[in-house]
């Protein structure tokens, strides 16, 4: 009743492209390289959750998720082009040659998937408030892409810490709409796995949100994320994003028998 376990399998597919252009002063033609990888394969996730009832309608939840180390299949292609301009376009590309990756053992490779663990804990008073924290760790320091070996890029173990929750002033209020709104908040500090030019990349974000009651038990969810990523010695980006979502109760999809 208070303990549950679960597992899931995910099929991953997609394509990565890496483009590079070399142009030297005094040389009319530059060299443009295009490397691409088509990724396919399964990843797995195992989770366990403990829900502990407490006094005063409180409950404590503890969650652990494990993403085991794995591998994805990578089919790789690399082509070299000559170009007679300082900017790349279809018109500027000249002769090209496809690299024989099979002879180098790089046409079909394995892309490692690092092991990831997630630990979460939260305290909730149902339909009133929630406060929680989450720690995520990814063992990515040994990650290596043998096909796309970028010289100025290395990897480290990644981790992130986040805190957040929600508050509903009075979920059963019949007088004030604003008291039935779910007010969400959260902060996250993320240490990325990638290192560029020996400089680590970190991300910090602040999240605010509103759960707006609409017909029945459905809600319209509004979210705002404000954050920064990178560092002053490399590339630093300040950003914000807006999100809108709908959570529809199944009563919307039940055909009425009487009008």
Where are each of the predicted segments found?
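Outer-membrane beta-barrel porins/channels
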Residues: 1-259
